[in-house]
Amino acid sequence: MITIKKQEIVKLEDVLHLYQAVGWTNYTNQPQMLERALSHSLAIYLALDGDTVVGLIRLVGDGFSSVLVQDLIVLPIYQRQGIGSALMKEALEDYKDAYQVQLVTEQTEKTLVFYRSMGFEILSTYNCIGMTWMNREK
């Protein structure tokens, strides 16, 4: 049975395998950055199968005006079982009073269908566009 738990402290060694399993090399090639990111997150929820971490959602932001879903990961063999939805629902419930919850994701049919099913809309719905700046030296 899968349980969802909000964690105050998340250790790198407990979740690095998730990032490796989905090929997020920006994190796996820079584990020190991920470790710092984990410790500075607004909230992290883990999906557990017994004692095994099989998924997580990581939020950043102030928790009131803006919350950003930075990471939502479920191990591939656990996907399509409602775990990602359960993680998202838990996070959205805890931050239901926030002005806005945002995320950036790959532009695929799979991700669009999933996030729309969770109530998210693309920014153009609000006559907005998203932008990002990345430090290309790192």
Predicted features along the sequence, with ranges:
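Short amphipathic alpha-helix that is part of the acyltransferase structural core
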Residues: 1-28, 126-127
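A short helix-loop-beta-strand connector motif used in the catalytic cores of GNAT acetyltransferases and
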Residues: 35-46, 99-100
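Short glycine/proline-centered loop/turn elements that form peptide/ligand docking sites
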Residues: 88, 109-111, 130-134
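Conserved active-site alpha-helix within GNAT-family acetyltransferase domains
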Residues: 107-128
